């Protein structure tokens, strides 16, 4: 008899399609100064406040409504009239924390998100359940870069042997690099993928939100296959039914995560240092996710920070890996050097993408991007003082081949974003 209980159902289904937490702060700041907020006021005020910090063009009018809805469920604002909302005591307290104690502000926001959505704890638990033998590492596939897939006419929706071969080779490559990262039966994968690919092709092409005749419209097989892969992998791995245990975590089908919501939750949970992800690992065709936190009955290690308000359905507390510098110094420096050398050997150029180095060091050491920045800053200062036998150079330039990655999370040291790193041994 299974004694594991269901997860508490969320009070709000459907996360807002934004990932910038400073939108909460700015909306509350407007509510405090103006005495209220509504959609029209946010549309006018927020773009001016976040210009240079957020891609303003990416904030749609729907996002403003999502923002109001979430702030209401968090208890930070309350409805006063048909369209106007006023800041609450809890909202004032959170706004104050944003100014004087950012760590506590993050804690408060995470606690509210857990209460409302349940997703933070559930998502981390699901990663561990999907790949318990390899530290919760999971891959959402994308077609291999060397796959040659030509464009087709929109109406040509045939699933070919070539698509089957590419789809199988893609997941086998990922599983070869990281064991257990894709717990999906191959034959079922191909069947589900074919159905989704053809479903996408059955839809009419659109331009500027309008359907257009498909007679002269071409489409990219790679793009359609990529979207189909991501859609069905997210549906399989992050639905209310656990694909490994075949048991339900929630009763309501609205708890199934969509690909769109998945793309929001990944950066949100990374911002909370619960997990990391990357779309740019050269060895992995797709998005690689891995937790940097885990659920435990108890903990005696000083390298972990507890979050008592984050519990799984077995009532275990979530602990985030937060090692201190003195405890991880040697491992960090050694790993940084090894990862840099691996990239250098493959690319044979001195300056390597700092984002690529960051992603792999974080994966190997299970540390957050924030800790990586702190530890890199310390290591850089040690190199300047010749306390290590290596010189480290950091550059803010962006190479031409890095333009497509400009929207990736940056690496910041002392408030400056760096994009390239070079490491050379000091010969005595």
Question: What does each of the following model-derived ranges do?
Answer:
Residues 324-389:
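Intrinsically disordered, low-complexity segments enriched in Gly and acidic/Ser/Thr residues
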Residues 248-255, 265, 345, 351-365, ...:
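Intrinsically disordered, acidic Ser/Thr/Pro-rich low-complexity regulatory segments
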Residues 272-276, 282-314, 385-428:
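C-terminal engagement modules used by replication, chromatin/transcription, nuclear envelope/ESCRT
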Residues 134, 379, 397-401:
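Short alpha-helical linear motifs
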Residues 2-339, 350-353:
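Donor-sugar nucleotide-binding helix/loop cap in glycosyltransferases
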């Amino acid at each position: 008899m299974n004694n594991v209980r269901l997860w508490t159902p969320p009070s709000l289904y459907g996360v807002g399609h934004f990932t910038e937490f400073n939108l909460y702060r700015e909306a509350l700041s407007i509510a405090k100064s103006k005495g209220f907020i509504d959609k029209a006021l946010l549309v006018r005020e927020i773009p001016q406040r976040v210009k240079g910090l957020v891609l303003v063009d990416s904030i749609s009018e729907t996002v403003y409504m999502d923002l109001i809805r979430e702030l209401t469920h968090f208890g930070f604002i309350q409805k006063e009239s048909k369209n106007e909302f006023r800041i609450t005591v809890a909202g004032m307290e959170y706004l104050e924390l944003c100014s004087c104690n950012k760590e506590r502000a993050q804690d408060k926001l995470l606690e509210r998100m857990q209460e409302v959505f349940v997703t933070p704890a559930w998502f981390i638990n699901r990663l561990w359940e999907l790949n318990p033998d390899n530290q919760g590492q999971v891959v959402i596939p994308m077609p291999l870069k060397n796959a040659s897939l030509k464009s087709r006419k929109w109406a040509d929706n045939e699933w070919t042997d070539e698509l089957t071969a590419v789809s199988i080779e893609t997941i086998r490559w990922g599983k070869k690099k990281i064991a257990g990262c894709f717990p999906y039966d191959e034959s079922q994968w191909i069947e589900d993928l074919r159905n989704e690919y053809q479903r996408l092709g059955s839809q009419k092409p659109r331009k500027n939100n309008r359907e257009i005749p498909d007679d002269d419209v071409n489409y990219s097989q790679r793009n359609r296959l990529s979207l189909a892969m991501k859609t069905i992998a997210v549906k399989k791995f992050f639905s209310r039914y656990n694909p490994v245990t075949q048991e339900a975590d929630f009763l309501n089908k609205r708890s199934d995560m969509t690909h769109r919501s998945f793309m929001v939750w990944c950066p949100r949970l990374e911002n909370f240092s619960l997990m990391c992800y990357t779309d740019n690992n050269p060895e992995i065709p797709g998005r690689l996710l891995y937790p940097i936190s885990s659920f435990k009955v108890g903990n005696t290690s000083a390298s972990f920070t507890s979050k008592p308000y984050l519990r799984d359905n077995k009532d275990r507390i979530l602990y985030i890996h937060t090692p201190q510098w003195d405890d991880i110094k040697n491992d960090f420096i050694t790993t940084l050097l090894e990862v840099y050398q691996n990239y250098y050997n493959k690319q044979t150029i001195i300056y390597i993408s700092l984002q690529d180095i960051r992603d792999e060091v974080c994966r190997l050491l299970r540390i957050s991007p924030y800790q990586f920045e702190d530890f890199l800053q310390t290591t850089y200062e040690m190199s300047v003082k010749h306390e290590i036998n290596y010189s480290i150079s950091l550059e803010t330039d962006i190479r031409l081949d890095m333009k497509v990655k400009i929207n990736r999370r940056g690496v910041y040291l002392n408030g400056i974003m760096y994009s390239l790193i070079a490491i050379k041994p000091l010969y005595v």
